[in-house]
Amino acid sequence: MTYEIQASVREAQGTGASRRLRREGQIPGILYGEGQEPVAIAVDHKTVFYALEKESFHTALIKLSLNGETKDVIVRDFQMHPFRREVQHIDFQAVKADQPVRIRVPLHIVNAENSQAVKLQGGRVSLLNTTVEVVALPANIPAFLDLDCAEVVAGDILHLSDIKLPEGVESVSLKRNENLAVATVTGKKR
């Protein structure tokens, strides 16, 4: 899914200026990367808030329009208000289509309900890590990675090497020869 966000350069910076922006329905943010100086920006709160609720937004290639120019960006970080449903700040990183990006991608468990551990042994599959850090070209970044648990039995430990990565996507940990555990399979307590 493609996301498009309108942004404007913000001149005033600091706590007071950020509060005024938020009262006007805007979010202070920053755009950096691609060999450019960081640019202080403001984006519409409603657009970003509802987009952040979608898991795919966090790994999507976003078209950010700034001063009539469109840049390809990814969300690098964001801060939420401690108790209100309000985004406080967002960081965008500009990316180039031909340069790999390092990003954390969500991990999904699939076929666990069909596994011997769950069906026959009354067990469950528990994720130890909900995301996996990968390196890929911006166009190849997956929305999520699947961990197939169809063949697991109670007591199994699933590692990064058990994840089938799409073509053009590499695990950062596997490149360093670190085959980390990502999920465990437990049997029913007796």
Curated annotation (Swiss-Prot):
Q: Listed GO molecular functions? A: 5S rRNA binding; structural constituent of ribosome
Which Gene3D superfamilies did the record assign?
Answer: Ribosomal protein L25, beta domain, Ribosomal Protein L25, Chain P
The name this protein carries in UniProt is: Large ribosomal subunit protein bL25
Tell me the organism: Neisseria meningitidis serogroup A / serotype 4A (strain DSM 15465 / Z2491)
What keywords are assigned to this protein?
A: Ribonucleoprotein, Ribosomal protein, RNA-binding, rRNA-binding
Q: Which Pfam families match?
A: Ribosomal_L25p, Ribosomal_TL5_C
Protein task: This is one of the proteins that binds to the 5S RNA in the ribosome where it forms part of the central protuberance.
A GO biological process held by the record: translation
Q: Which PANTHER family match?
A: RIBOSOMAL PROTEIN L25/GLN-TRNA SYNTHETASE, ANTI-CODON-BINDING DOMAIN-CONTAINING PROTEIN (PTHR33284), RIBOSOMAL PROTEIN L25_GLN-TRNA SYNTHETASE, ANTI-CODON-BINDING DOMAIN-CONTAINING PROTEIN (PTHR33284:SF1)
Q: Which GO terms of the cellular component aspect does the record hold?
A: cytosolic large ribosomal subunit
Instruction: Read off the lineage from the record.
Output: Bacteria, Pseudomonadati, Pseudomonadota, Betaproteobacteria, Neisseriales
Gene behind this protein: rplY
- Domain of life the protein comes from: Bacteria
Partners and quaternary state?
Answer: Part of the 50S ribosomal subunit; part of the 5S rRNA/L5/L18/L25 subcomplex. Contacts the 5S rRNA. Binds to the 5S rRNA independently of L5 and L18.
- Family per record: Belongs to the bacterial ribosomal protein bL25 family. CTC subfamily.
